[in-house]
Swiss-Prot record:
It comes from Oryctolagus cuniculus (Rabbit). It comes from the Eukaryota. One of its GO terms (cellular component) is extracellular region. InterPro entries: Ig-like_dom, Ig-like_dom_sf, Ig-like_fold, Ig_sub, Ig_V-set, IgHV. Keywords: Adaptive immunity, Immunity, Immunoglobulin, Pyrrolidone carboxylic acid, Signal. Pfam families: V-set. Coiled coil: none annotated. This is Ig heavy chain V-A2 region P-MU-3. GO terms for biological process: adaptive immune response. The lineage of its organism: Eukaryota, Metazoa, Chordata, Craniata, Vertebrata. Residues 20-127 form the Ig-like domain. The modification Pyrrolidone carboxylic acid is found at Q20. Residues 1-19 form the signal peptide.
Length: 136
């Protein structure tokens, strides 16, 4: 009986984990000065309760924070002049828009959400990432 309850609990926990997911839309190949639009779709929790972070990782480099949307919208200093982050809580999506792309924007872009309020960045559920290449 005890073993059966343990299995039931394990299945319930795993099912709960599987129900929460975050995924970025497809990236692709862009030309310099193009505009990038990426959408982060979350399921299993509501964006009215949790914020979303965007980060990116250029080839051979570390993670670079782009911005966050939750109770407010915050952007890295380098991104402020050409980036916007908007949220659609009805569709549970967050959109990152970045204009005037250059080769330096070539990176894998990630969004993360679903974390607890106290530590949203580190405890977030992150998407698999999407590769964006900027080249003429």
């Amino acid at each position: 009986m005890e073993t059966g309850l343990r299995w039931l609990l394990l299945v319930a926990v795993l099912k709960g984990v599987q129900c929460q997911s975050v995924k970025e839309s497809e990236g692709g190949l862009f030309k310099p000065m193009d505009t990038l639009t990426l959408t982060c779709t979350v399921s299993g929790f509501s964006l009215s309760s949790y914020g979303v972070n965007w980060v990116r990782q250029a080839p051979g480099k570390g993670l670079e924070w782009i911005g966050y949307i939750g109770t407010g919208t915050y952007l890295a200093n380098w991104a402020k002049s050409r980036s916007t982050i908007t949220s659609n809580t009805n569709e549970n999506t967050v959109t990152l828009k970045m204009t005037s792309l250059t080769g330096a924007d070539t990176a894998t872009y990630f969004c993360g959400s679903g974390a607890n309020i106290e530590n949203e960045f580190f405890n977030a559920i992150w998407g698999p990432g999407t590769l964006v290449t900027v080249s003429s």
